[in-house]
Amino acid sequence: MTSNPSSSADQPLSGTTVPGSVPGKAPEEPPVKFTRAAAVWSALIVGFLILILLLIFIAQNTASAQFAFFGWRWSLPLGVAILLAAVGGGLITVFAGTARILQLRRAAKKTHAAALR
C-alpha cells in the first residue's frame, strides 16, 4: 500500500496490452455503406430546409411588383414572382435534362445493337 494514488493496484501497467490486440492501433470499424435510401433521406432533408428558407423569403417579400409580358400587365407579390421564375427555370432544366437522357439512351441502344451483330 502506497500513498501515491496514481499507482493503485486497480490500474493496469502502462506497458501492458490487451491479449489479441495490436499495440498502438485502434480497432478498425467497417466502412459505412452509401445506399439509395440514405441518399433519398438526405435529399428530402435538404429539400425541406430549402423549402423553409423559401417560405421565409416569400413571407418577407410581400411588396407588390408590376409585371408586363407581351402586352399583358399584372401585379404579384415579389416573393411569389421570384418563386414562379425559379419553378419555370427548374422546369426548363428538367425538360433539357430529359431530352439529353433520351438522346443518350437512344445512342446506347444503337451501340448495344451493333455490338451484338
From Swiss-Prot:
Compositionally biased spans, kind Polar residues: 1-19
GO cellular component entries: plasma membrane
InterPro entries in alphabetical order: LapA_dom (IPR010445)
Entry's transmembrane regions: 38-58, 76-96
Annotated segments matching region Disordered: 1-28
Compartments reported by the entry: Cell membrane
Principal localisation: membrane
Annotated keywords: Cell membrane, Membrane, Transmembrane, Transmembrane helix
Membrane topology according to the record: Multi-pass membrane protein
Protein name in the entry: Uncharacterized membrane protein Rv3760
Organism: Mycobacterium tuberculosis (strain ATCC 25618 / H37Rv)
